[in-house]
C-alpha cells in the first residue's frame, strides 16, 4: 500500500512537471534555423502521407508557398506565432479535413477540476457570422446584454472585424466551396480566441442591440 501511495505521489508530481514544462515551451521562441526545418518537415510529411494533396492546389503553387514562408522567417518565433504563419498554407490546400491546430496550454488537475464546476465564457452562446460581423444566435441562460440578435463589436478591446480577418486564414474548406466557412468560423472562433488569449474568467465586450451600444463584461459562473 505504501509503495502504491508513493507511486501515485510520484505520478502526480511528474504530471505537474510535465504540464509546467509543456506550458513553458509556449513562451520560448524557436530559432530561425529550427523553424525553417519545421517548415521543411511539414512539407515533406504532407507530400508523403496525404494521398490527394494536389487536388485543389498545384505542386508548384504549394512549393512556392512553403518557400515564401521560409523567406519571411527572419527572427525567432514562439510556437503559436509560428502557427499563425504556417496554418494559412495548410488552409490553402483546400482540404476540409486537413487542419493545423495551435499549441494549446495544458491544464493542471486543479485547474481542470475548477473549470468542471463552471460554465463556459464564450462557448455558452451560439453565434452567426455575416461577413466580418458576429451576432448572438441564442442565449439559453439569458445572460444580460447578450440578447438574440446582439452584434458583438469588440472583444477585449479588439475589433471583431480585425479578429475575424486574422482568423479567416485558419478556416479551411473543400476546394472553392466557401459556403461552409462562415458556419465553421461561427463554431471555431471562440476556441481560436481562447487559444490565443488563454482561459479567461471574464472578458470585456462592446456590443450593439437595437441601435444601442453598450460596454460590459461577461463572466464565468459556477454550475448550480
Model regions: which residues?
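Sec-dependent N-terminal signal peptides
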Residues: 4-13
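Flexible, low-complexity junctional segments that flank or bridge functional domains
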Residues: 17-224
Amino acid at each position: 500500500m505504501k509503495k502504491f501511495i508513493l507511486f501515485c505521489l510520484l505520478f502526480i508530481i511528474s504530471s505537474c512537471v510535465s504540464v509546467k514544462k509543456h506550458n513553458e515551451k509556449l513562451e520560448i521562441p524557436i530559432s530561425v534555423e529550427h523553424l525553417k526545418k519545421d517548415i521543411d518537415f511539414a512539407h515533406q510529411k504532407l507530400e508523403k502521407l496525404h494521398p490527394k494533396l494536389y487536388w485543389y492546389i498545384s505542386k508548384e503553387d504549394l512549393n512556392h508557398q512553403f518557400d515564401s514562408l521560409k523567406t519571411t522567417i527572419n527572427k525567432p518565433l514562439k510556437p503559436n506565432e509560428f502557427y499563425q504563419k504556417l496554418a494559412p498554407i495548410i488552409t490553402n490546400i483546400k482540404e476540409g479535413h486537413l487542419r493545423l491546430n495551435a499549441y494549446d496550454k495544458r491544464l493542471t488537475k486543479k485547474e481542470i477540476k475548477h473549470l468542471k464546476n463552471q460554465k463556459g465564457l464564450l462557448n455558452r452562446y451560439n453565434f452567426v457570422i455575416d461577413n466580418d460581423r458576429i451576432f448572438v444566435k441564442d442565449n439559453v441562460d439569458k445572460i444580460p446584454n447578450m440578447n438574440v440578435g446582439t452584434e458583438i463589436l469588440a472583444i477585449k478591446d479588439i475589433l471583431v472585424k480585425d479578429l475575424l480577418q486574422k482568423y479567416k486564414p485558419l478556416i479551411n474548406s473543400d476546394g472553392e466551396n466557401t459556403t461552409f466557412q462562415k458556419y465553421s468560423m461561427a463554431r471555431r472562433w471562440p476556441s481560436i480566441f481562447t487559444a490565443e488569449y488563454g482561459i479567461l474568467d471574464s472578458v470585456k465586450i462592446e456590443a450593439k442591440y437595437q441601435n444601442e451600444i453598450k460596454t460590459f463584461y461577461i463572466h464565468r459562473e459556477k454550475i448550480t
